Design a protein with these regions (language model features):
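Conserved acetyl-CoA binding element of GNAT-fold acetyltransferases
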Residues: 40-51, 110
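A conserved beta-strand-loop-helix scaffold within acyl/acetyltransferase catalytic domains
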Residues: 32-39
Length: 117
């Protein structure tokens, strides 16, 4: 299924401390969370794709859908950050391929950011 044909369920919440969106990919094959608050800005977290559905473009579709929501509902130009375990070189490389850059690193976590997406 082409990325443009994917379907998502988006659940939005407003909290005292900010807003969250949870995006679920077609038939529950994967999900990602967007959080926005005054302290941390916009953060992607919890990207998860069921093992049998990996390497089929679902993770990429979820990240791109999250970026679309940030552009349209939060505002274009808002930086998006995320954290990856520093030992997970494959995932760091994948996020780099998607356009994210490392902006902070320690032995436990690598912080990545995308701007002008």
């Amino acid at each position: 299924m082409a990325e443009s044909e994917r379907r998502f369920i988006v659940h939005r919440n407003e909290w005292i401390w900010g807003r969250t969106w949870v995006i679920v990919a077609e038939v529950g094959t994967g999900l990602i969370k967007i959080s926005q608050d005054e302290d941390d800005g916009v953060v992607l977290s919890g990207l998860s794709v069921l093992p049998e559905f990996r390497h089929k473009g679902i993770g990429t579709s979820l990240v791109r859908e999250a970026e679309r929501i940030v552009r349209e509902e939060i505002g274009a130009g808002e930086d998006i950050t995320l954290s990856v375990e520093s030992k997970n070189k494959e995932l760091i490389g994948w996020y780099s391929w998607l356009g994210y850059s490392v902006y902070d690193y320690d032995r436990n976590y690598t912080e990545m950011i995308i701007v002008n997406y």
